[in-house]
Amino acid sequence: MKTSDPRLTKALAHPLRARILADLERQTCSPRELSDELGEPLGNVSYHVRQLAGLGLVKLVKTTPRRGAVEHHYRAVHR
């Protein structure tokens, strides 16, 4: 992905964000699923997914109830 926006360049320079974005280009996942798949703490993954969503690189596509909470599922936005 090529970009001239410095915010996007900085966001994509972070290794974990790049890995998350690559996974979400292939499949829809929740932060918990990404955490398990990438072997990273859930808090870190959730933070970076929110950052990517704030930049419009991923979007919320589905919510499902899970143990009294709501699980959010994201997918990469193709630009």
Question: Each PLM stretch: what is its role?
Answer:
Residues 56:
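Glycine-centered, phosphate/nucleic-acid-interacting loop/turn motifs that mediate DNA/RNA or nucleotide
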Residues 20, 59-61:
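A short linear hydrophobic-aromatic micro-motif
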Residues 22-24:
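Short alpha-helical segment immediately N-terminal to, or the first helix within
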